[in-house]
Amino acid sequence: MTDFYWELPSRGDGRRVASELNTRGGFGADRPATVATDLRPGKLGPFDELAQVIHAAELSGVDGVIAPYDPSGEESWVVAAAALRQTRHVRVAVEFHPAFGTPVYAAKMSATLQRLSSGRLEWRLKVETDPADARARGDQVTGRDRYARADEFLTVARGVWNDSEVLPGGFGGTGYEFAGNHYDVIDGGFRGILSGLPFPVVHLTGNSDEAVTLSAKHGDVHQFVLTDTGYETSARTLADRALEQGRSVRKLLRLPIIARETTDEAWARVERLWREAHPDGVSGDSRALARENSQWSGFDRLGYDQPIGLIGSYEDVARELSSFRHIDGFVLTGRPHIEELHRAGEHLLHLVDPAGRTLAGQEAHA
């Protein structure tokens, strides 16, 4: 079965490219209603609209959602906790960086969230952050040391975690010891209600050699993005290095999408957004960034955090998603999120994964 995750918004949502024009989630300027049915202020809070996105994800049948780390957006841990409380089935991945806190503290928070959610919390560790963001947080770890710290972080977090239940024992731990360059733990380990829980599934990202090495050792899932040089070489290297350690790592591909009933309708949406983002027309024609197989390299000019994604009819986008080799699933996103989630759930996911998402497919594999 193909896994599908959806990346949640972190700074509000809406149909426009300019964030100040998007009023969902309380980030843009308030806009007067054209039809006044209820003028009472405060009837809909800023988090209610994000809650609707999360609810749409559950209804649409995606397997999980991701609360991204965003220094200027909503706190990902709070969003993830709210999503776990609101849902019953979807997995929820919280993205955070190792400087967020000690690995023991992150593990303890996660243990409580696993109790709350019947084990649906996952982690996406963001090892590399923008240098300006790191300085603003007082984080002085740079370069390859970031991966060394992440290695220690995940080692300690797993070390204090006990998958089997351990009876309470006063204030003592379970004897876990660790002495590293970034963390030191003496008599660590969880007991009582913090034990006997599944450790969060660990997602890691990046195409660099350091990223692949870290994922081969610690990752359960690795998320790639499409680049001009592709992801296939890194994916094969990851599989080989994980196998050397007796492990396997699932591979996901992160992609923004614009999918509609017809290809022309999808491109009409792109061109409306392009004209808004480039009203002077000096940036050229949006179709000049079209690539083969429904790929388009202009998503970063429309406010997304990566350039390459997919545009086309539902059939075209599904065909391209199905063609990616060495990939076990996808992290999709699109704006506005509520509408795009419902489109994906109703028209796209079953085309990519008929065996897992249609009755006929499930009966054929029974």
Name every feature range the model reports, one short phrase each.
Residues 48-68, 214-224, 322-328:
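Catalytic domains of carbohydrate-active enzymes, especially glycoside hydrolases
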Residues 76-94, 346-360:
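Alpha-helix-loop-beta-strand connector modules within alpha/beta enzyme cores
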Residues 12, 16-19, 33-41, 105-218, ...:
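Internal, glycine-rich beta/alpha segment that forms the wall or movable "lid"
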Residues 1-87, 199-200:
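N-terminal beta1-alpha1-beta2 module of alpha/beta enzyme domains
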Residues 55-59, 81-88, 110, 114-121, ...:
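Acidic (Asp/Glu)-rich catalytic clusters
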